[in-house]
């Protein structure tokens, strides 16, 4: 009987029309004035009429009730296109409704965006500091209570102006006292903003602000022909206009709300002179502007309202009252407001159901408005049934209604279809017998005390048959009174609200009394109806007694007796129900007393909790501001630290590369030092042998004269052999050129490979740059959120990327090292092959040299010169022994100075180590230079005296002697930055009297070997050299290295050197020397030392096996490795000492020259010319050494360290490289 209407529960409170905003606030009662169709009477012929339709009229009566303090009203509502600002751009959310809601008594105003009445989108509380930023093209932006930026576009300019105007009025209403001018842009325009001193023509309209809205219009330019002209800052208008119109632009419109304090100017008010204490509202539009500032200045005075500054953080009272899923009619909870709840809800249900206070207030207001009004409408007069049937139906409905209604649960619908405003009407008396107790019973849930009443409803079942016979609508009506379940669950994230007020207990008591009176009235009506029914039954019995027969009369009497028994039973049950109702009413009063106590206690708790929440919200706000500031600071520091880390890693890689290069330099210098020591030992042995052979040469000189004539004939034969050897030499030169071409091709290949490697490195850098850009974007995203999990994830990602970066860098470094190692091994293999060829050429040259020396040893002039210079040999021996001791002394001095700079247990940076080593080497080098300059000055003075003595005796060899004596000091004097080129005349005149074949072959072999090694090593280092450098190859012979051959300074200087040497070649070549040009291009690495050793070897006896022939140029001796170009700076010290050895050997060679003159005097002129002609022509190669030494000394200043594989080596620019 009571469970047949479950299908219609969801439609009980559904609206009849669309989702209109007016249904939220009780403005659509005019459309619902026809009553609730569920409670209309229908004839038995139409039992189901109107059951499926929606009901919207159960709250139609109080539509004229005035508004109360707890009901929000709609100030303006319109349709907008909403955009939400996410990830740096506005994303369209669709077409929403936008409304400004306000409660004037509580001074609370809000902007609401909603999709429908059940789906609110966002809420923004309007306060004095709230900013609604107006944009062109009907756009406006604001921040909601969750600090989310929204942009809304109105469909028309009129709607935008009205909405903005209501927002400004709401800002004014939200404060109790207005102290400053409030302004709100209604329409924004482009162009410069007005400032103080500008002249304006404005159109305005002024209202008085009355009862929270715009009141009477007291002045306007709409009815005037001319606009108002004014000048800002002149004082002729009120202060509110002076302040409020700053920053406006031509064509812009603004709403100004001026308090009384700002409504008077220095010279009165503009269009009205009466004094007023009201707030004035102006709508001002700028029509024309004349700027006072110059036309060239471009200053823009923009007020704060035009900026995009975010609105302030919402107050503490908004944090818990406005969840995301709150209903659109929600108003934030505020301490001091009466939080009304339904009387019949139990405490557990009140705590479990998290409804917003606005919904509870709206329901309570609707219940109070319907107090004492009929639930059922007045029946129309055209019903077919008689009065008794109507009365019986009304009796059943009136008696059954209180039984059914307690089981109806309250609806948790977020937007009630009609929210009537509270009325002050008293309960009205019932008009007819169809009045129900109260409509408020339809919206409350049952208390435990009502369960008995609902259980006793089964006592009315005997009337079911009668209802089905005459009034089938009764069951349909009761079926509609089932509990209405909520149409959507309560919001899960919303905290429970605690409400309470002082007048709640009195209100509940009055409502309980009204319920009791209504129940008593209903019971009395039931008793009256029963008495009326009894009288009718008695009349029927009397009427049918005389007219019916026995059998019908017995059936009638049986029927009436059954009816009478039922009536008696009903009367007894009615008495029992009356007693139960009295007991329950007493129990309800007790429960009401308890509820009032609990409400008072709850009120105290609510006040305390509100205070605590306010304190917590304030502390949370300060904490969040502090944390945001800290996060920003931490992010800035993080960016700085990442930049420093990148710079540090780059510097570490550079220093590691430098450290490896210096380690290689150190090992090579140590090898060179050991080899130089071995070479000094060999020179000592050779010097002792030369002394022993001097005595033998005295004996053999007598035999040399007799053999001279025979050897003269042999000389012609040897000249023929020399020509053949020269042909072989040309062939070897062709081979040399082919090998040089191969080397150049290999250099080009290495250059291409290096360029490819650099391109790969550039691509890797670009990829790393893209990864860094992505990381920066991630950093920007993480700055918005303060979630710690996101920060940890970011740190993990950064750590992984850093490890990947380091792994990739190590992998690339290893691959680059492998490539350079392979190239170095290939060049070493080529060098070994060239060395083998060089050994073969040296053997041929040595054989020829032995034959030539056998001829020249027979000259008596050498014997006489050696006898004269015996006293000078002791100085030569001492000079030869000096280099080893000096080398030891210098290295010991370097070691001791470096040892003082470092401690064994300390760790040092690579930059500091490099700088210390460079300073130490520089200091030792400068000390040696000072000593060497003194020695050079002494030796040069002695040699000049010797040259002065030899010039009258040797006119043909005057230039040769001067060049040989002066040339050894050239490398010493030119050891510092200036190193000019050696003149080609000296190269030609510095000739040793040897046959051209030996010198050509030996020097060509040395040149090839030096070429192969120097170019191979330079190819490893630089990858490619300019083609001009092929004309000046690097040479090396067995002997103490005078300098470490570096790479020339550049292609320009080498071109000039080649051009000078080639230009001097015609002067160097004699008429009978066909290979003069080639000799100019050949450069000897160790000119002075080779010259002296060659001159000493001239006196060896051919019968003794020529022990000196293999001394300086023995192919079996290991030759010192040629260092790289960047190792020049580390070899300054040993080079200086070995230069002293050259000076000593040169002195010995100069001492031998007088013997040549004596020998020449004993011979005839023709024979002498024939003997020394060819040797003089070919003597160019040994003296080309100063030119190369000059180049070496220029490069002694040091070339910068090699460019690292990764990154720019800008950090090393500040190191003064030995300069």
From Swiss-Prot:
Write out the annotated subcellular location. Answer: Cytoplasm; Cell projection, Axon; Early endosome
GO terms classed as biological process: endocytosis
Query: Which ranges carry the PPIase FKBP-type domain?
Result: 197-290
Q: Where is the composition biased (Basic and acidic residues)?
A: 1123-1139
Q: Does the keyword Chaperone apply?
A: no
Q: Which residues carry this modification: N-acetylmethionine?
A: 1
Cellular component terms per the entry's GO annotation? actin cytoskeleton; early endosome; growth cone; membrane
Q: Which residue windows does the record flag with biased composition (Polar residues)?
A: 53-66, 421-433, 1090-1100
Complex formation: Interacts with WIP and actin. Interacts with TBC1D23.
Q: What does this protein do?
A: May be involved in the cytoskeletal organization of neuronal growth cones. Seems to be inactive as a PPIase. Involved in the transport of early endosomes at the level of transition between microfilament-based and microtubule-based movement.
Entry domain remark: The PPIase FKBP-type domain seems to be inactive both for FK506-binding and enzymatic activity.
Q: What is this protein called?
A: FK506-binding protein 15
């Amino acid at each position: 009987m009571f469970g047949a209407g479950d299908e219609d529960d969801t439609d009980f409170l559904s609206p009849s029309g669309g989702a209109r905003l007016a249904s939220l606030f009780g403005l659509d009662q005019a459309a619902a004035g026809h009553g609730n169709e569920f409670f209309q009477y229908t004839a038995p012929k139409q039992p189901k009429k109107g059951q499926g339709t929606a009901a919207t009229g159960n709250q139609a009566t109080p539509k004229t009730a005035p508004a109360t303090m707890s009901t929000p009203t709609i100030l303006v509502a319109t349709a907008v296109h909403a955009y939400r600002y996410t990830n740096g751009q506005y994303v369209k959310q669709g077409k929403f409704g936008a409304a400004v809601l306000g409660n004037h008594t509580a001074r609370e105003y809000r902007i609401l965006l909603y999709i429908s009445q059940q789906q609110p989108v966002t809420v923004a509380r309007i306060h004095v500091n709230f900013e609604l930023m107006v944009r062109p093209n009907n756009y406006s932006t604001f921040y909601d209570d969750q600090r989310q930026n929204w942009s809304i576009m109105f469909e028309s300019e009129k709607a935008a102006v009205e909405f903005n105007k209501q927002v400004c009025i709401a800002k004014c209403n939200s404060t109790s006292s207005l102290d400053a001018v409030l302004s709100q842009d209604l329409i924004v325009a482009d162009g410069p903003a007005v400032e103080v001193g500008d002249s304006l023509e404005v159109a305005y309209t002024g209202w008085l602000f009355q009862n929270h809205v715009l009141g009477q219009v007291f002045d306007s330019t709409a009815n005037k022909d001319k606009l108002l002209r004014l000048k800002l800052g002149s004082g002729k208008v009120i202060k509110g206009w002076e302040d409020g119109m700053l920053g406006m632009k031509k064509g812009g419109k603004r709403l100004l709300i001026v308090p009384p304090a700002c409504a008077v100017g220095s010279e009165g008010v503009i269009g009205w002179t009466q004094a007023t204490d009201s707030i004035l509202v102006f709508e001002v539009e700028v029509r024309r502007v004349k700027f006072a500032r110059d036309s060239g200045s471009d200053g823009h005075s923009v007020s704060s309202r035009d900026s995009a500054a975010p609105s302030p953080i919402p107050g503490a009272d908004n944090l818990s009252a406005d969840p995301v899923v709150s209903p659109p009619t929600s108003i934030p909870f505020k301490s001091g407001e009466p939080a009304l709840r339904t009387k019949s809800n139990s405490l557990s249900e009140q705590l479990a159901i998290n409804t917003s206070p606005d919904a509870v207030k709206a329901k309570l207001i609707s219940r109070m408005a319907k107090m004492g009004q009929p639930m059922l409408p007045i029946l129309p007069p055209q019903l077919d049934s008689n009065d008794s049937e109507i009365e019986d139906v009304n009796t059943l409905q009136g008696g059954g209604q209180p039984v059914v209604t307690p089981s109806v649960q309250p609806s948790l619908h977020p937007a009630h279809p009609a929210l009537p405003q509270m009325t002050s009407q008293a309960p009205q008396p019932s008009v007819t017998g169809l009045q129900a107790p109260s409509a408020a019973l339809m919206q409350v849930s049952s208390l435990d005390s009502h369960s008995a009443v609902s259980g006793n409803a089964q006592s009315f079942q005997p009337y079911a048959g009668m209802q089905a016979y005459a009034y089938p609508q009764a069951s349909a009506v009761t079926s509609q009174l089932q509990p209405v379940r909520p149409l959507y669950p309560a919001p899960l994230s919303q905290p429970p609200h605690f409400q309470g007020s002082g007048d709640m207990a009195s209100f509940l008591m009055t409502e309980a009394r009204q319920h009791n009176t209504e129940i008593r009235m209903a019971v009395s009506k039931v008793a009256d109806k029963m008495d009326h029914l009894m009288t009718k039954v008695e009349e029927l019995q009397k009427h049918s007694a005389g007219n019916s027969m026995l059998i019908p009369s017995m059936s009638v009497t049986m029927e009436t007796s059954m009816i009478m028994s039922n009536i008696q039973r009903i009367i007894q049950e009615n008495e029992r129900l009356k007693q139960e109702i009295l007991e329950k009413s007493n129990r309800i009063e007790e429960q009401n007393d308890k509820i009032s106590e609990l409400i008072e206690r709850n009120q105290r708790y609510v006040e305390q909790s509100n205070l605590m929440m306010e304190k917590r919200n304030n502390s949370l706000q300060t904490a969040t501001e502090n944390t945001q500031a800290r996060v920003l600071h931490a992010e800035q520091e993080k960016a700085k630290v990442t930049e420093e880390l990148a710079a540090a890693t780059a510097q570490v890689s550079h220093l590691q590369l430098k450290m490896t290069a210096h380690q290689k330099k150190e090992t090579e210098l140590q090898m060179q030092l050991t080899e130089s020591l071995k070479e000094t030992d060999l020179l000592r042995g050779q010097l002792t042998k030369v002394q022993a052979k001097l005595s033998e040469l005295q004996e053999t000189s007598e035999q040399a004269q007799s053999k001279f004539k025979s050897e003269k004939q042999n000389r012609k034969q040897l000249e023929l052999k020399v020509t053949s050897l020269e042909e072989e030499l040309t062939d070897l030169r062709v081979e040399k050129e082919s090998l040089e071409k191969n080397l150049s091709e290999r250099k080009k290949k290495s250059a291409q490979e290096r360029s490819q490697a650099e391109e790969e490195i550039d691509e890797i850098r670009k990829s790393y740059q893209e990864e860094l850009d992505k990381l920066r974007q991630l950093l920007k995203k993480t700055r918005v959120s303060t979630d710690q999990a996101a920060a940890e994830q970011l740190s993990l990602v950064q750590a992984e990327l850093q490890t990947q970066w380091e792994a990739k860098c190590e992998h690339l470094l290893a691959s680059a090292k492998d490539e350079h190692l392979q190239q170095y091994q290939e060049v070493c293999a080529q060098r070994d092959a060239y060395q083998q060829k060089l050994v073969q050429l040296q053997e041929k040259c040595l054989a020829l040299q032995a034959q030539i020396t056998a001829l020249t040893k027979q000259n008596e002039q050498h014997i006489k010169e050696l006898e004269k210079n015996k006293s000078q040999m002791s100085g030569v021996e001492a000079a030869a022994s000096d280099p080893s001791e000096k080398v030891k002394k210098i290295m010991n001095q370097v070691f001791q100075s470096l040892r003082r700079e470092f401690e064994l247990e300390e760790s040092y940076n690579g930059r500091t180590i490099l700088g210390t080593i460079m300073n130490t080497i520089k200091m030792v080098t400068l000390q040696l230079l000072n000593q060497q300059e003194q020695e050079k000055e002494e030796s040069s003075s002695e040699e000049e005296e010797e040259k002065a003595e030899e010039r009258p005796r040797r006119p043909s060899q005057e230039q040769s002697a001067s060049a040989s004596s002066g040339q050894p000091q050239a490398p010493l004097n030119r050891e510092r930055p200036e190193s000019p080129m050696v003149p080609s005349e000296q190269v030609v005149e510095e000739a040793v009297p040897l046959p051209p074949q030996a010198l050509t072959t030996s020097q060509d072999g040395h040149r090839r070997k030096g070429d192969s090694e120097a170019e191979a090593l330079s190819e490893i280092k630089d990858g490619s050299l300019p083609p001009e450098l092929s004309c000046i190859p690097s040479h090396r012979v067995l002997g103490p290295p005078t300098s470490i051959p570096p790479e020339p300074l550049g292609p320009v200087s080498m071109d000039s050197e080649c051009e000078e040497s080639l230009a001097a070649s015609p002067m160097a070549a004699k008429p009978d020397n066909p290979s003069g040009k080639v000799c100019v291009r050949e450069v000897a690495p160790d000119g002075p030392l080779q010259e002296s050793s060659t001159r000493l070897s001239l006196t060896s006896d051919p019968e003794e096996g020529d022990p000196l022939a293999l001394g300086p140029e023995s192919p079996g001796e290991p030759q010192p490795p040629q260092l790289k170009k960047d190792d020049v700076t580390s070899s300054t010290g040993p080079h200086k000492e070995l230069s002293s050895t050259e000076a000593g050997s040169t002195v010995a060679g100069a001492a031998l020259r007088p013997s040549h003159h004596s020998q020449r005097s004993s011979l005839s002129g023709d024979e002498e010319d024939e003997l020394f002609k060819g040797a003089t022509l070919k003597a160019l190669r040994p003296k080309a050494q100063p030119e190369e030494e000059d180049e070496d000394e220029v490069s002694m200043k040091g070339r910068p360290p090699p460019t690292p594989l990764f990154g720019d080596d800008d950090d090393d620019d500040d190191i003064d490289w030995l300069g």
